[in-house]
Amino acid sequence: MKELCYGSVCSGIEAASIAWEPLGMRPAWFAEIEPFPSAVLAHRWPHVANLGDMTKLAKKVLAGEIESPDVLVWGTPCQAFSIAGLRGGLDDERGALTLKYVELANAIDDKRSESFLKPTVIVWENVPGVLSSADNAFGCFLAGLAGEDAPFEPGDRPESGKSNAFWRWDGKTGCHAPKWPQCGCIYGPQRKVAWRILDAQYFGVAQRRRRVFVVASARTDLDPATVLFEFEGVRRNIAPRRKKKEIASAIIANGAAISGESLNPCLHADMPPSMKSTKAVNAFRMAAFGEYIDDETASTVKARDFKDATDLAVFSSTGAGFWSEGHGTLRAREQESHEHLVTLAFPERMSGTQHAATKNTSPSLMAKNPTAVCYEVRNAEVAVRRLTPVECERLQGFPDGHTLIPTEKRKKVNSDELAYLRNHYPDLSEEEAAMLAADGPRYKAIGNSMAIPVMRWIGDRITKAVCRQKEGSETKERKVKPAAEFERSIFKWAGGKFGVLEQIFRYLPEGKRLIEPFVGGGAVFTNAGYQENLLNDVNADLINFYKTLQREAHSLITLAHRFFQDYNTQEGYLAVRNAFNKQVYDDLHRAAAFLFLNRHCFNGLTRYNQAGEFNVGYGKYKTPYFPLQEMEAFLGAEGRSEFVCGDFAAVIEAAGEGDVIFCDPPYEPLPNTEGFTNYSGHDFKFEEQKRLVSLLTDAHRRGAKVLITNSGAPNIRELYHDSGFRVEPLFARRSVSCKGDTRGVAHDVLGILL
């Protein structure tokens, strides 16, 4: 499978690359403006361009100056949505960058569509505070990604001054603030979007770090919900106990001892006499990343401990132990002479970050790896120290020393620091040590980054989802229905091929993908049974209908049926046609109106004048047929279909080995007849016929197989013969004509290049 490439915005020190490169993904470019993270990128990834200001990327993508990646990842500045940043939201320029991200994602999708590449997959990370930002920043972001014009809201708003499950009344501002759920998904007109809060502590790092992750895409073969969500029965995380236990609270009231249920004879919910102590362990609350305060606040029994900024450090102090009658499981000798004990717990297995607890230490609980050991306290004056930068790197899952890079700024290095560095880098000179990055920028960059294991999990699920689609797109035998079960077209369409499908399928070869440069009514791809379909037409209204039916089937079918019921009169028809030509409809209503006009106009003719206006008159049909069955067949058709609107050349130039091209262009008029070749406001003269044939022969040389239909005009037969086509007869009955006597059997031709 071709490796996935990704573009990283607000890259920081590139948690995405550390997580995704081992999965076979490749960075296309970075975008970071902060000096120190940019220096880390330049040092660790010198071969990847750092494009700097992300607000300028959309124009560069559209101009083709930079690659349009398969995946777009971004961790927007979280300060605008965090408590520490006072939640400036969209009023803060950092929060407004989130909307620039939507602009960039749209530009990437537009550029990729020009090359018939699938839309990008979007990955976004931020703090949980974004879910309750007073300006509904998250709802704006979701709407932008999904393609809606108005912000989404989490639910119905209550009356002023009241709160409910979805909104919180803020008495200071006199406004409601949203309360978005911790996970959810939205299927919008442009993209599918899913979000979920993930906590790094369940992915193998020793910190609580809850973050909102959003995955979105316009791909029809990938559902973001399947990337972020898991079935409850197969989740790897056991839900933590958050309910306060009375017995546990009583036990730890004067320090840390034992809590929990009776799991093992050596650990009881009721404290054994030998483990009683007077404040033998102190609890420290995390005030900032790597900094702790001894304020005698036991974070472990706080309800807010579930939140992000309450990591806990515990150490043994000089508490006085005592003994009472009875024997304990951890006592070495009697009376008050026993050593104070500190319990340290280690995870049984941590992918990529496992460390042994100690050597020659008897495990207290497990028969496998030592997961809990007890240490004797020798020093009565133990103090909590600040975490070192390398420990912070480990907390995020980075390799040791990831941010320890040479800089151009000299710093003072004392003897202790030099000894510490030389312990890791024995050959490091004092001058080299002085030029290494200072701790301050390292702490900031690490704290602003993402947890590697969480990003790896998301990247792995994206690559597996895409890989499954790739595996499923291998060439398989087509599933062609018998003629009696062929599905009719949704539209009445001039030159439709439903009546000649048996003749066409006799010559249509096997292949991985069907390409139709002139899809029209769609009878061929609907019944041909290919695994993939690339379908083009110059008629923008036709393509809009197909895309809308793919995206909003229920809404479109319901709305179109209402048009059929309400407007089947001369006045109603003209009112719809007038609104259609004035471009007052959105995509959904325009699609419904297009189907209505096609089924109610004279002879089902789709025709536009030079001004681009639909100009066919009312057909005066008593009960026009509503194609519900045909639309359902479209939705249930074999394979994945991608619709594009434009010149036929683009999709033909995309063809290669394994592709089958079926071409049904506007027919060349027969001699002494008046052929109409301008149904969509685009002329199709004989010069266009020659250009089309030239493109088809080029595609055949690249490995594509070609079928083309046309009239039996002598100049067409000559053109096809001279270009190497095998020409076969195609007998068709004309179904659309202003003159009834011309709706007879036509002797058309099939040009074949296999």
Curated annotation (Swiss-Prot):
PROSITE patterns, per the entry: C5_MTASE_1, N6_MTASE, SAM_MT_C5
Tell me any Pfam family this protein matches.
DNA_methylase
Q: Which UniProt keywords apply?
A: Host-virus interaction, Inhibition of host innate immune response by virus, Methyltransferase, Restriction-modification system evasion by virus, S-adenosyl-L-methionine, Transferase, Viral genome packaging, Viral immunoevasion, Viral release from host cell
MF terms from GO for this chain are: S-adenosyl-L-methionine binding; sequence-specific DNA binding; site-specific DNA-methyltransferase (adenine-specific) activity
Free-text cofactor note: Presence of Mg(2+) enhances the ssDNA binding ability of the enzyme.
Q: Which EC class does it fall in? A: transferase
**Catalytic center at which residues?**
78
Domain named SAM-dependent MTase C5-type: residues: 4-469
Biological processes, Gene Ontology terms:
DNA restriction-modification system; methylation; mismatch repair; symbiont-mediated evasion of host restriction-modification system; symbiont-mediated suppression of host innate immune response
Known catalysed reaction(s)? a 2'-deoxyadenosine in DNA + S-adenosyl-L-methionine = an N(6)-methyl-2'-deoxyadenosine in DNA + S-adenosyl-L-homocysteine + H(+)
- Asked if the Swiss-Prot or TrEMBL record annotates the protein with the keyword Lipid metabolism, the reply is no
How does pH influence this protein's activity?
Optimum pH is 8.0.
Named cofactor requirement(s): Mg(2+); Ca(2+)
Report if keyword Nucleotide-binding is assigned: no
- The EC number on file is 2.1.1.72
Q: Which InterPro entries match?
A: Ade_MeTrfase_dom_2, C5_DNA_meth_AS, C5_MeTfrase, DNA_methylase_N6_adenine_CS, MeTrfase_D12, SAM-dependent_MTases_sf
Per its database record, what is this protein's job? Methyltransferase that methylates adenine residues in the ssDNA and dsDNA sequence 5'-AGACC-3'. Essential for genome packaging because methylation within the pac site makes the latter cleavable. May prevent degradation of viral DNA by the host restriction-modification antiviral defense system.
The family classification in the record reads: Belongs to the class I-like SAM-binding methyltransferase superfamily. C5-methyltransferase family.
Q: How does it assemble?
A: Homodimer.
Q: What is this protein called?
A: DNA N-6-adenine-methyltransferase
What's the source species for this entry? Escherichia phage P1 (Bacteriophage P1)
Q: Which gene encodes it?
A: dmt
